[in-house]
């Protein structure tokens, strides 16, 4: 009887354990009441051919015939997703701009994780806006990539259209704007 009870309790504990998430905070306690809504774009599918590293004046057909398809080029097929994030700003001082910068950094992180195949969930974790992914999937991904000992870049970042220089200028301008608002 004791063994049966022990097995029952162990089984109940396994059922009650919730899913673990690895979260990256957006470093802001001034944004609260986070709500997200992800909906699929109804009625259509996207086929996107990303041509990259093609010499100037060479067409896609000529490149495929002469060189084959480059490993850096991808064709993306899928249904676009509309993601709505709603947040209330509780402090209207210079921290408002800092909050927006931190949130944009979180969105870049989320786009990278989404590009790698993770389902990103935004949530309020202990009062801090965070981008979360499934912990088991994250550990498997890190383990897989740390076991590979080569540093070949075999993908391009589809969602990153801003260069590091543009991001530095955007950060500088936003910080100057925050200082002017504080004065």
Swiss-Prot record:
Pfam family, one: Arteri_GP4
GO biological process entries: symbiont entry into host cell; virion attachment to host cell
Cleavable signal peptide: 1-22
Coiled coil: none
Stretches assigned to the Virion surface side: 23-157
Record-annotated membrane-spanning stretches: 158-177
Glycosylated position list: 37, 88, 124, 134
UniProt keyword list: Glycoprotein, Host endoplasmic reticulum, Host Golgi apparatus, Host membrane, Host-virus interaction, Membrane, Secreted, Signal, Transmembrane, Transmembrane helix, Viral attachment to host cell, Viral envelope protein, Virion, Virus entry into host cell
Recorded topology in the membrane: Single-pass type I membrane protein
InterPro entries the UniProt entry points to: Arteri_GP4
Topological region Intravirion: 178-183
Similarity-based family: Belongs to the arteriviridae GP4 protein family.
Subunit structure, interactors included: Heterotrimer of GP2a, GP3, and GP4. The GP2a-GP3-GP4 complex associates with the E protein. Interacts with glycoprotein 5. Interacts with host CD163; this interaction plays a role in virus entry into host cell.
Role of this protein: Minor envelope protein. Along with GP2a, serves as the viral attachment protein responsible for mediating interactions with CD163 thereby playing a role in virus entry into susceptible host cells.
Protein name: Glycoprotein 4
Taxonomic lineage: Viruses, Riboviria, Orthornavirae, Pisuviricota, Pisoniviricetes
